[in-house]
């Protein structure tokens, strides 16, 4: 099965409306860069989320995951409120492309949090997955993750002066040197640990 990435943006009159929407107003699953997270208030709230799928079927059902890290190559950020960037689950309709309704497929359990203030630009930034995040990795299929702001995860309304942005390279950028990646360390039934890297 193939995998993909995409970003989704929506606008609402208030915070609860915009994060509770079923479908995004716009989406992009073909750009070389995309909004990983985005929250901003003008006269209405604007929120973006992103989805990343990785084909991890080569791990195999008999193996055990010990460590896992998702890394994204950041290209731009803006920080006002100092929110976190959170890895969550996702469950898009397709494993090969986006629909607007995928906006609401992201979960509300954080698998990894990194402060937006600490994100480095023009560099990979690592999100080490906790036990729930590792459990979300498919041993025989496609592993489905996404990104939200910390306040989007907890449904906590930011101050109207808040503005948080993070943009990163997507799989469609030229080459693989900046691709989103999932690095998994797993144990074979009888052999030593093995590291494998997947690019989406």
Q: Where are these predicted regions, by residue range?
A:
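Active-site-proximal beta-strand/loop segments in catalytic clefts of secreted hydrolases
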Residues: 56, 72-75, 90, 148-151
